[in-house]
UniProtKB/Swiss-Prot annotation:
CDD domains: AdoMet_MTases. This is Chemotaxis protein methyltransferase 1. GO terms for biological process: methylation. InterPro entries: Bact_Chemotaxis_MeTrfase, Chemotaxis_MeTrfase_CheR, CheR_C, CheR_MeTrfase, CheR_N, CheR_N_sf, SAM-dependent_MTases_sf. Residues 1-274 form the CheR-type methyltransferase domain. The lineage of its organism: Bacteria, Pseudomonadati, Pseudomonadota, Gammaproteobacteria, Pseudomonadales. Its EC number is 2.1.1.80. It comes from the Bacteria.
Length: 274
């Protein structure tokens, strides 16, 4: 094995232990593209040196590396159907079952905030057409591993490029305030439903409490089968009986029939906690 390949193996082990992400052996180009600038700034010549520096030094290097490797582009109202299923099927059902209690939604691995803010907009749209049905309100808890992503998400400000990814002109006008050339901010009424917290999905979820819905979309694809199963079992522990799990369009929940019931929607699939 060449020195470069050995260094890459060291880094793969570090990343999986730190945040569960499994890198294929063909992902050296991805690691280079994400870390070259940081390594140059830090005067680090190889991935092996980077891992050694992380292990022997205190400071923010570990967080900067994890930030660089876990930051992903995201969309407003990604795949559309989960938000329609939420409004047309899940909210009416849970309101009926919950007897007027506040509903809680967890947006796991929320990145720069588009998913939780999309959820808050969908809640607002539901309220406008179902007056008085959500008297106790809805709390959205949004978590991410990346400190820089959480800072950006809390700020709730986006540029033209981000705004063009899945947001209709009507929603832009209704739910955002212009903040100068090419920048918009999520309106306070939409932001007020969302609470952002730092969380590594490998860590305990006990502090989060119980939820009526969990959105863990386009996240599990990065984990090994073993870690994925562990996360899904622990998510089940955060769901109230009859609560719903939303996964990504290309993700499936296999081999957990004692915990989740598949619910066919049109289109899409969601999962009800047993």
């Amino acid at each position: 094995m060449s020195a470069a390949n050995a260094d890459f193996e060291l880094f793969r082990v570090f990343l999986e232990k730190t945040c569960g992400i499994v890198l294929g052996s063909n992902k050296q180009y991805l690691v280079s593209s994400r870390l070259n600038k940081l390594m140059e700034q830090q005067g680090i010549k190889s991935l092996g040196e980077l891992v050694q520096r992380i292990q022997t030094q205190r400071g923010g290097l570990r967080e900067m590396v994890v930030d660089a490797m876990t930051t992903n582009e995201t969309l407003w109202f990604r795949d559309t159907y989960p938000f329609e299923v939420l409004k047309q099927r899940v909210l009416p059902e849970l309101i009926k079952a919950n007897g007027g209690q506040r509903l809680r939604i967890w947006s796991a691995a929320c990145s720069s905030g588009q998913e939780p803010y999309s959820l808050s907009m969908a809640i607002d749209e539901f309220e406008k057409t179902n007056l008085g049905q959500l008297k106790a309100g809805v709390q959205i808890v949004a978590t991410d591993l990346s400190g820089s992503m959480l800072t950006a998400a809390k700020a709730g400000e986006y540029d033209t490029l981000a705004m063009g990814r899945g947001l209709s002109p009507e929603r832009l006008q209704r739910y955002f305030d212009a903040k100068g050339p090419g920048r918009w901010a999520v309106k306070p009424a939409i932001r007020s439903r969302v609470e952002f917290r730092a969380l590594n999905l490998l860590d305990s979820y006990a502090s989060l409490g119980k939820f009526d819905m969990v959105f863990c979309r386009n996240v599990l694809i990065y984990f090994s089968a073993e870690v994925k199963r562990d996360i899904l079992l622990r998510i089940h522990g955060t769901l109230k009986p009859g609560g719903y799990l939303f996964l990504g369009a290309s993700e499936a929940l296999n081999n957990l029939p004692d915990h989740y019931q598949m619910v066919q929607c049109s289109p899409g699939i969601i999962y009800r906690a047993k």
